[in-house]
């Protein structure tokens, strides 16, 4: 069994490649860049991995669904809302269903598993935790959510600090821990070490489990 710790855009190629050649692959996804917008709960890294495994990903952009349309976003702009976060119409359906399931008491891990089943994905995909974990960047004295810093402000401005809000209280998903413990090989996929991998290894217990594979 191979277990991959993955971000989104930088990790999805490796995930797809291994999943196409190996039958027993587990993917543990970062959740530090999850974001509430328009009342929808958006999980960019999880969705990128799922879309990639389902061959739905817009490979040119590295995110979102290929050939998606943006009528929803245009209408939000007409109604006076900001449109800096590019949500496609089909992508919006994913966020809407996830948000409704969360409001009905489902955990993020349950929803992720359900979505994998809907897309006929055999590879197991787990969020690193079902708890709140948020990556925030301090720039010019202001604390910004990672999406606001990278997407809204395009990464402009000095980085004065980085915080993983909730990492000290978040519990690693038991299935994710088991996937690390039972793996013959654990791979940390390509990704930003601070914003994709950092949130995961700052959760209590994850670094300890990974250190067992140190050669």
Regions found by a protein language model. Name each.
Residues 1-3:
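Extreme N-terminal starter segment of soluble prokaryotic enzymes
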Residues 10-15, 195-199:
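Short glycine/serine/threonine-rich phosphate/pyrophosphate-binding segments
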Residues 19-23, 207-214:
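Short, conserved loop/helix-junction motifs that constitute active-site signature segments
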Residues 26-32, 214-215:
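Short internal beta-strands
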Residues 166-171:
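Short gly/ser/thr-rich secondary-structure transition/capping motifs
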Residues 200-207:
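Charged helix-capping and loop-helix junction motifs
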């Amino acid at each position: 069994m191979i277990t991959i710790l993955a971000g989104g855009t930088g990790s999805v190629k490796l995930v797809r490649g291994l999943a196409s050649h190996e039958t027993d692959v587990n993917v543990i996804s970062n959740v530090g860049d999850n974001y509430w917008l328009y009342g929808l709960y958006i999980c960019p890294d999880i969705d990128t991995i799922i879309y990639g495994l389902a061959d739905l990903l817009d490979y040119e952009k590295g995110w979102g669904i290929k050939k998606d349309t943006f009528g929803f976003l245009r209408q939000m702009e007409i109604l006076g809302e900001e449109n800096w976060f590019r949500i496609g119409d089909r992508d919006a359906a994913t966020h809407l269903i996830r948000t409704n399931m969360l409001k009905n008491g489902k955990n993020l891990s349950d929803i992720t598993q359900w979505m994998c089943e809907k897309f006929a994905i055999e590879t197991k995909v787990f969020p690193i935790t079902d708890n709140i974990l948020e990556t925030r960047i301090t720039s010019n004295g202001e604390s910004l959510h990672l999406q606001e810093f990278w997407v809204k402000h395009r990464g402009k401005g000095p980085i004065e600090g980085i915080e993983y809000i909730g990492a000290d209280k978040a519990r690693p998903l038991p299935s994710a821990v088991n996937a690390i413990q039972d793996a013959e090989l654990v791979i940390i996929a390509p990704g930003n070490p601070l914003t994709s991998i950092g949130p995961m290894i700052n959760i209590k217990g994850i670094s300890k489990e990974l250190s067992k594979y140190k050669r």
